[in-house]
Amino acid sequence: MSKNYHIAVLPGDGIGPEVMTQALKVLDAVRNRFAMRITTSHYDVGGAAIDNHGQPLPPATVEGCEQADAVLFGSVGGPKWEHLPPDQQPERGALLPLRKHFKLFSNLRPAKLYQGLEAFCPLRADIAANGFDILCVRELTGGIYFGQPKGREGSGQYEKAFDTEVYHRFEIERIARIAFESARKRRHKVTSIDKANVLQSSILWREIVNEIATEYPDIELAHMYIDNATMQLIKDPSQFDVLLCSNLFGDILSDECAMITGSMGMLPSASLNEQGFGLYEPAGGSAPDIAGKNIANPIAQILSLALLLRYSLDADDAASAIERAINRALEEGIRTGDLARGAAAVSTDEMGDIIARYVAEGV
């Protein structure tokens, strides 16, 4: 690859800097093995930015992200900043404004049960034995969270509250295309989640998804009601490849998918805009209770790098190399403390070293 790429690196707070260090070790291995020209610049965000600049998202950080091809984000927040007004705290003052500024309308959250980690899955052993590898594609900027009107009015027995589920054609079309394009990189199946037996917004959702599906004759499309989908994820998650969801339904199902893997330390997340620019981050939090102890699981951060390579840099070979290296490490029984269950555990640094070495060796 001859193109030059630039990544904005935002380590953040808590375990963020520790796990980000491991992801950058792996990036070095990718650069060397695949002869990719990738540069990085570090910027403060969240609590670290409050401490150093007096605000959770400094203008220099936003400008640095604007000049990058993608953003690799760590995690933000912690007890130190909880006394601040909500809109000035690291989470609401940094991550949400970044999503809004870059018009990140789609959220991709993979949930995979890795071989050797079946015991962590809360489902029945015979279900866990089948494994699963699901990508939840969630629309982020429309739906009931943002629809108008919303509010409260009246008093006494006539007091009421109301929210409005609104979806425009363009919002459904663009998130559907993300799901179908993602399925082409995976197992060629999309399951669209709705409530088209009741909701007008879901009827439109299903109609438009069917229209977009005609552009992807190689992709199998199924529709499923949200209530049935929550049950089917428990009954047989292996049946799913890509889940296409509205904002509300994706909020619910992505967390359910995460829960059945058994470890938040393994789950990456991507938020994309229409130009393919993305913000990539672990699905878990900043875990301030274990920060600085060199025991955090860096795999979610490393997998976030893999997503960045796949979706923003179109480097699928490099992303797959990272995923294979992680699979190899787990198959060999290499575990950080959250996965060790009394067995010997490796440190954050050691896990990063092992995965980087496996990428370099081309396992």
UniProtKB/Swiss-Prot annotation:
The keyword Amino-acid biosynthesis applies. Pathway: Amino-acid biosynthesis; L-leucine biosynthesis; L-leucine from 3-methyl-2-oxobutanoate: step 3/4. Its main location: cytoplasm. Its cofactor is Mg(2+); Mn(2+). Mg(2+) binds at residues 227, 251, 255. It comes from the Bacteria. NAD(+) binds at residues 78-91, 285-297. Belongs to the isocitrate and isopropylmalate dehydrogenases family. LeuB type 1 subfamily. This is 3-isopropylmalate dehydrogenase. It comes from Escherichia coli O157:H7. The lineage of its organism: Bacteria, Pseudomonadati, Pseudomonadota, Gammaproteobacteria, Enterobacterales. The gene is leuB.
